[in-house]
């Protein structure tokens, strides 16, 4: 969400991300908006668990929370808890194949304080999402597909995507 009323946004990204994989990652980004004199930003936490010599090689779970403005004196809070299960062939670690099962819950809530020219009242928006990905990222052959399902109080959605690329000699 971008808001021109905020003017210049000043922020800092504080995290423990590095070159090597860590079991626990965090990121905190407070953002101060000069014109509106507000503090927004986001927080992310993630926990990784790796398994050696198993087809299920990684489980990671975490949560991200974002608080931002979308109009003058109007803010939105987005919270996303998630868990991912990542698979690979434990007998051939050079095989560039990815299989992943992701589950997440997206919750969006808008806070209104008399927004000009906006007649809509947006209720909280909550969606449960499950996605399975299977892909092979080879030099000569590439294929990737996913099956995605989303469920809410008011709708359900099922989607499928398939990508293929072959390199000619």
Predicted regions and their residues:
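Sequence/structural signature of outer-membrane beta-barrel proteins
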Residues: 31-35, 50-52, 66-72, 90, ...
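A short acidic (Asp/Glu
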Residues: 37-41, 74, 157-161
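Gram-negative (and chloroplast) outer-membrane scaffold detector with strong preference
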Residues: 78-84
């Amino acid at each position: 969400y971008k808001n021109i009323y905020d003017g210049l946004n000043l922020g800092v990204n504080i995290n423990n991300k590095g070159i090597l994989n860590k079991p626990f990652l965090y990121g905190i980004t407070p953002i101060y908006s000069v014109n509106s004199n507000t503090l927004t930003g986001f927080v992310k936490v993630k926990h990784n668990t790796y398994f050696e010599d198993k087809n299920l090689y990684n489980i990671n779970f975490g949560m991200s929370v974002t608080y931002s403005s979308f109009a003058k004196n109007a803010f939105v809070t987005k919270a996303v808890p998630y868990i991912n299960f990542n698979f690979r062939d434990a007998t051939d670690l050079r095989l560039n194949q990815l299989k992943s099962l992701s589950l997440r819950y997206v919750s969006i809530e808008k806070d209104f304080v008399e927004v000009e020219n906006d007649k809509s009242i947006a209720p909280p928006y909550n969606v449960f999402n499950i996605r399975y990905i299977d892909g092979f990222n080879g030099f000569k052959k590439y294929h990737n597909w996913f099956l995605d399902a989303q469920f809410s109080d008011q709708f359900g959605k099922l989607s499928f995507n398939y990508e293929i690329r072959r390199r000619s000699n």
